[in-house]
Design a protein with these regions (language model features):
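Alpha-helix N-cap/helix-start positions at coil->helix boundaries
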Residues: 22-25, 56-57, 93-95, 110, ...
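Alpha-solenoid helical repeat scaffolds
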Residues: 30, 46, 61, 83, ...
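Amphipathic alpha-helical scaffolding segments comprising HEAT/armadillo-like alpha-solenoid repeats
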Residues: 3-17, 38-52, 72-89, 109-121, ...
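Non-membrane alpha-helical segments in proteins
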Residues: 25-34, 48-49, 56-71, 98-103, ...
């Protein structure tokens, strides 16, 4: 691969990243995103070099740039994915692992899914959250989907960390897979202490027309905190038992009047 010398602007971005030394800062990510968009062969070359650097900060940045190169996020697929594959089996630094999880997700590496599922019990809640976010949503239209993906999501939706449960429940609510185990998991999450997780569970149960989800949903629609997902779940259920609570919401709920009107019509 012929590599052109880096431009002055590229050099400025790399130098700024070196100076900031903070992989979580917005300023660092402004430079990472800029380098991704530039997406030249010189950006690729520097990213690949940083991926093999002894410094975990550099490795994390290198992987983060490789994750989405070019305007379409998929430039230099062979070079980028080859490096990502070589790293997932050996990397031990937590920050680099989180960057690798994102790279596996954005590059759509199906061979990286077993590695993702292996991280579901990782002691770092940030890594478990990234796994819940990155796992492909199981779909019966794609029978090649690893069965372990669904099992991992079921495990993560019972994670002690709320944001992990939220993402895992979100994925379960969207999958077209259905089973008693999935329904029981969603019913459990419908009573979760976390508001967002409860909301995602309500939609998942509505998508499956699960009768046991209706009574709790009525209660949530009558509460003083009603999110759009609860109203969306009511629209999906289209059950007359939900209509009185929806009609009562017209007195004060102004988040999405059109959605509320559709839900009332569906339940009429």
């Amino acid at each position: 691969m012929e590599c052109n010398p880096p431009s002055e602007l590229e050099q400025q971005h790399w130098s700024a990243i070196e100076s900031l030394r903070d992989v979580e800062s917005d300023a660092t990510w402004d430079h990472v995103i800029a380098l991704r968009k530039v997406g030249t062969s010189s950006v690729l070359e520097r990213s690949l070099a940083w991926c093999t650097d002894p410094d975990p900060y550099r490795r994390s940045i290198g992987v983060s740039v490789l994750a989405q190169l070019g305007d379409d996020g998929n430039r230099y697929p062979e070079e980028a994915t080859s490096m990502i594959r070589s790293m997932i089996g050996t990397e031990s630094d937590h920050e680099v692992i989180t960057s690798l999880i994102s790279a596996v997700h954005f590059r759509g590496l199906s061979e990286g899914v077993p590695w993702l599922t292996s991280l579901a019990l990782h002691p770092s809640e940030n890594i478990r959250w990234r796994v819940a976010w990155a796992l492909p949503i199981p779909n019966t239209l794609h029978p090649g989907t690893d069965r372990s993906t669904l099992d991992t999501l079921l495990r993560l939706c019972a994670d002690p960390e709320p944001r992990v449960r939220d993402w895992a429940t979100f994925s379960l609510s969207l999958t077209d897979e259905d089973s008693p185990q999935i329904r029981e998991a969603l019913l459990t999450r419908l009573n979760d202490s976390d508001f967002d997780t409860r909301s995602e569970a309500a939609v998942g149960l509505a998508n499956r027309k699960e009768e046991r989800g209706i009574e709790p949903l009525v209660g949530y629609l009558k509460s003083d905190r009603v999110g759009e997902l609860f109203v969306e779940a009511a629209e999906i259920y289209a059950d007359p038992r939900l209509k009185p609570a929806l009609v009562a919401l017209q007195k004060w709920w102004d988040i999405n009047p059109d959605l509320l009107a559709r839900a009332i019509a569906a339940c009429s």
